């Protein structure tokens, strides 16, 4: 029997506890999960690709069945290279679904062997996004419940002049 490999793609700028929740729940379904940081030309990130990879690796270091990687180009091509057939995506709200549905349909049209598995985020993370975390961090807000400790430290470095509440 072949390994069940899924790819969880995203910008992860930075990884949040919501992302980690999807990763851990995905491990209940798949033998291997590849967290794949996309080179997205439409987004300018706060963290470099290498910084994001390092933060994700630190976050998932206790889970050997998680592999952290990066890719350029089409997701369908990346999945083919990784011998994976499943795209794992987290959904926070109906607004996420509309865009994700279109991407899933396009990916499946380009390669009918690929499927997308949507997981609803846990209720405690339904509002959480990397953008919101960055904004709260920039204003010195408490982000302890939103991100892994390594990300909190990295955000403090990115926003050294932010007012501190801790």
Swiss-Prot record:
Organism: Syntrophotalea carbinolica (strain DSM 2380 / NBRC 103641 / GraBd1) (Pelobacter carbinolicus)
GO CC terms of this entry: cytoplasm
Residues reported in the UniProt entry to bind ATP: 11-12, 19, 90-92, 100, 125-131
One GO MF term: pantetheine-phosphate adenylyltransferase activity
Record-annotated site: Transition state stabilizer: 19
Catalytic activity, reaction form: (R)-4'-phosphopantetheine + ATP + H(+) = 3'-dephospho-CoA + diphosphate
InterPro entries to which the protein is assigned, alphabetical: Cyt_trans-like, PPAT, Rossmann-like_a/b/a_fold
Keyword Nucleotidyltransferase: yes
Pfam families: CTP_transf_like
UniProt keyword Nucleotide-binding present: yes
Gene: coaD
Residues reported to bind substrate: 11, 43, 75, 89
Superkingdom to which the source organism belongs: Bacteria
Name of the protein in question: Phosphopantetheine adenylyltransferase
